């Protein structure tokens, strides 16, 4: 839970989503392979391999999604109208996610790492077929999460630590019919985020519960879109405390 209703957490008023990712222990071998195919030559390949023991689970997910995204259209900007084919809108995403859970008597240790690499080409504007440009974007990230939960009959405490690293690249170049560059825009943006959370929940009396949380965020971004001599890598440190009592009168 990285956010929830405000009566039990410091989540947003606009609404948040809690994702349940509870693993099943003592299930033995984990093996799942899938292949999909769709329109515009779209392919999806997915593989999950792992093992589930009595108090230990380890698995790795790997995937690859790609599509050509080519399609025909009628270009009304030419005289006479022409049936043409739009190209260079392809994309590919691939990544892997190792996961591990270890269960002790009254505690649970969890580790998850989601790593993805993406490349997407952007086509020329459809009516302007003679515009010579090359345009694409890359988005790579690594999101890592470590959690230790200790629980007792009337409550629990959880310590969570995460590290998010992301790199976004945008490239746009226009060139002449001879292949000589005219303009170029190459943007590189990076972000690094550390997040540490201590979360406590304790039953008090009947339906009454105590919720408390301490959270520290350390964030750093850098971008080639700004002058490095005037704007260094911006940093932000946020320390937040939260406590609430919830129950029925």
Label the predicted regions.
Residues 29-33, 58-60, 109-111, 157-161, ...:
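Transmembrane beta-strands of outer-membrane beta-barrel proteins
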Residues 35-39, 53-55, 64-68, 104-106, ...:
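Transmembrane beta-strands of outer-membrane beta-barrel pores
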Residues 16, 55-59, 73-74:
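Residues embedded in well-ordered regular secondary structure
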Residues 67-73, 83, 87-93, 107-157, ...:
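Flexible loop and strand-edge segments within Gram-negative outer membrane beta-barrel domains
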Residues 21, 50-53, 102-104, 149-152, ...:
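Residue-level signature of outer-membrane beta-barrel architecture
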Residues 1-28:
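A beta-strand signature from Gram-negative outer-membrane beta-barrel systems
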Residues 13-15, 29-31, 43-47, 94-98, ...:
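Hydrophobic, lipid-facing positions within transmembrane beta-strands of outer-membrane proteins
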Residues 137, 163-167, 175-249:
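Outer-membrane beta-barrel transmembrane domain signature of Gram-negative proteins
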